[in-house]
Curated annotation (Swiss-Prot):
Taxonomic placement: Bacteria, Pseudomonadati, Pseudomonadota, Gammaproteobacteria, Enterobacterales
Transmembrane spans: none
A biological process from GO: ribose phosphate metabolic process
Protein name: GDP-mannose pyrophosphatase
Gene Ontology MF terms: hydrolase activity, acting on acid anhydrides, in phosphorus-containing anhydrides; metal ion binding
Family note: Belongs to the Nudix hydrolase family. NudK subfamily.
The gene coding this protein: nudK
Annotated disulfide bonds: none
Keywords: Hydrolase, Magnesium, Metal-binding
Positions that bind GDP-alpha-D-mannose: 38-40, 67, 85-87, 104, 127, 150-151, 176
Subunit organization: Homodimer.
């Protein structure tokens, strides 16, 4: 099936932190049937995330961070256990994720492996996330001062097997983190 889009009109609804647009357009299917659709689209830019793992120790490095949207949606304290991540801004995905790893974990990682890209919520958000993995070792830790601006972050080192179990029991609920941990499990990054 293929579709054709015509008569696209955009209205800016908000440009506070990110941009929220209302799009009105005609969607035409293979049979030539045209249906007018209206969608709100949130443009927050693209991002990157990374799974930091230590193969000899069988551990992963995650962060516990306050996320207001999770609090609003029933997470009692708003804290979310996740892989470090950030928006690209004007950096390449590789530059972004090295910077974010340093800012959020205190580890300086040089060699990062790009795994894949994914839309995380394509029904309403434009963002593509670039997924990475990298090994970390104790000698790469350069600071205990983590987080920037008003971020509330705790660095958490866990056995990989425990992190996998935390998906099943609901202690890890972040989609990008689940995807990276399962990628590591499927591809044998840690034994």
């Amino acid at each position: 099936m293929s579709v054709k889009i015509e008569n696209i009109r955009s209205e800016l609804l908000s440009k506070n932190w990110f941009k929220l647009h209302k799009y009105t357009f005609d969607l035409i299917d293979d049979n030539g049937t045209s249906v007018q659709q209206i969608r709100e689209v949130y443009d927050r830019g693209n991002g990157a995330t990374i799974l930091l793992y230590n193969r000899p120790n069988g551990t992963v490095l995650l962060i516990n961070q306050f996320r207001m949207p999770t609090y609003v949606n029933g997470n009692p304290d708003g804290m979310l256990l996740e892989t470090c991540a950030g928006l690209l801004d004007n950096d390449s995905p590789e530059e972004c994720i090295r910077r974010e790893a340093m800012e959020e974990t205190g580890y300086q990682v040089d060699s990062v492996q790009k795994l894949f890209e994914a839309y995380m919520s394509p029904g309403g958000v434009t963002e593509i996330i670039h997924f990475f993995a990298a090994e970390y070792h104790a000698d790469q830790k350069v600071t205990d001062d983590v987080g920037v601006e008003d971020e509330v972050i705790e660095v958490v080192e866990l056995p990989f097997t425990e992190a996998i179990a935390m998906i099943a029991d609901g202690r890890i609920k972040d989609g990008k983190t689940i995807m990276l941990l399962q990628y590591a499990q499927i591809h044998g990054l840690l034994k």
